[in-house]
Curated annotation (Swiss-Prot):
Name used for this protein in its record: Histone H4
Function in brief: Core component of nucleosome. Nucleosomes wrap and compact DNA into chromatin, limiting DNA accessibility to the cellular machineries which require DNA as a template. Histones thereby play a central role in transcription regulation, DNA repair, DNA replication and chromosomal stability. DNA accessibility is regulated via a complex set of post-translational modifications of histones, also called histone code, and nucleosome remodeling.
Gene3D superfamilies referenced in this protein's UniProt entry, alphabetically: Histone, subunit A
Source organism: Euplotes crassus
Protein's cellular compartments: Nucleus; Chromosome
Any single Gene Ontology cellular-component annotation: nucleosome
Disordered: annotated segments: 1-23
Recorded family membership: Belongs to the histone H4 family.
PROSITE patterns, A to Z: HISTONE_H4
Length: 107
């Protein structure tokens, strides 16, 4: 039936509410989600045997800065293409722009 919208069963539309989204939680330091064991595993993969306790906070700070710059460039590519979804190619091009070529994801 025309004019019924996307409701499915029709009706007058009383009580219809848009899609419910998750409520915003108070922003906390999400960088702390990069846990100490995760940093240890990355260091082990790089061949590190012992890690100073000062390394963890410094690693989080460096990682946060790196990700901010890559995400900023990726979003710039996405906006230029008039899209709202960041694609893998946007990230590949952002990394390439920063001199860190990544293979295996197209482009």
């Amino acid at each position: 039936m025309p004019g019924r919208g996307k409701g499915g069963k029709g009706g007058k539309g009383y009580g219809k509410v848009g899609a419910k989204r998750h409520a915003k939680k108070a922003l906390r330091e999400t960088i702390l989600g990069v846990t100490k064991p995760a940093i240890r595993r990355l260091a082990r993969r790089g061949g590190v045997k012992r890690i100073s306790s000062l390394v963890y906070e410094e690693t989080r700070a460096v990682l946060k800065g790196f990700l901010e710059s890559v995400i900023r460039d990726s979003v710039t590519y996405t906006e230029h293409a008039k899209r709202k979804t960041v694609t893998a190619l946007d990230v590949v091009y952002a990394l390439k722009r920063q001199g860190k070529t990544l293979y295996g994801f197209g482009g």
